[in-house]
Amino acid sequence: MTASSDARIPDQYAARLVDPKAYATDALHETYTWLRANNPLGIAEVDGFDPFWVVTRYQDLQDVSRDNQRFPYGNRPSTLMNRASASKSMQTQETPLVLSLIQMDEPMHMKYRMLTQPWFMPANLRKREEEIRQLARKSAARMVDMGGQGDFVSGVSLNYPLEVIMNILGVPEQDLPYMLKLTQEIFGPLDPDIQKTMKDIPAAEMSQIQQAVMGEMLGYFDKLTEERRKNPTDDLATVIVNAQVDGKPITSSALNGYYMIIAT
């Protein structure tokens, strides 16, 4: 993995990387195709942003993600932000709202990962096997009720994985439609059909919408946290909210990070 002598990415390609609207068009595919062929390890310089490196080849990405000594995550935000947004974020909160495993360097990453790893051992998961099979039967029944024709995604594939995850987490069954709504709103920009309705929404407004949805989801998990501290059960939420690292309860941002990485 070596940068070329002129590693600077041409302006038209660099600008697309920070333009939310580009992610709803084929222009982004063209950009990454050009980068992989001509400048796989380049630096983007865009007005309003600090210069940032862009790694586009698979093996290089693997090398970077596995070498946290040379490429530490540090205290940088999990998403690319312009200077104004980064400054505002630093001024309005002392610690990040969400700190997940994917944002942690060693040795912190392993300490937090080990908090829940025992819960996912086969012996423990077998205790929930019948509940998960019941969810699968309900999902299959919904498909049968379509009468041989219907939307498999909205009728089956969106619901069943979420139902299993929420069962593991400890979310009550009656709250599943609400959680499905929130997860769809968070990941709406990745859906080609939703992209068509979003393409004309200004980037700043879109960011506000997604932040509001995330805040709503975290508000729900705050209530779940309070409930599990009062009434612990055998679910994963109970493990997370009562977890400790180095003899101290985990921070609210780390707790939020665990919820988000599991729920989404």
PLM features: what roles do these ranges have?
Residues 172-174, 225-234:
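Proline-centered turn/helix-capping motifs that create local helix->coil transitions or kinks
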Residues 1-153, 162, 166-180, 184-212, ...:
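Active-site substrate-recognition loop segments, prototypically the cytochrome P450 B′-helix/B-C loop
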Residues 158, 162, 214-218, 245-264:
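Central I-helix of cytochrome P450 enzymes
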Residues 144-149, 230-231, 245-250:
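Short, glycine- and charge-enriched coil/turn segments that flank and shape catalytic ligand pockets
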Residues 213-230:
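C-terminal domain-closing interface element
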Residues 161, 221, 240:
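Conserved hydrophobic/aromatic pocket- or pore-lining residues that grip, position, or stack substrates
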Residues 121, 125, 226, 245, ...:
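Alpha-solenoid HEAT/Armadillo repeat architecture
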Residues 180-181, 229-240:
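Short, charged hinge/linker segments at domain and secondary-structure junctions
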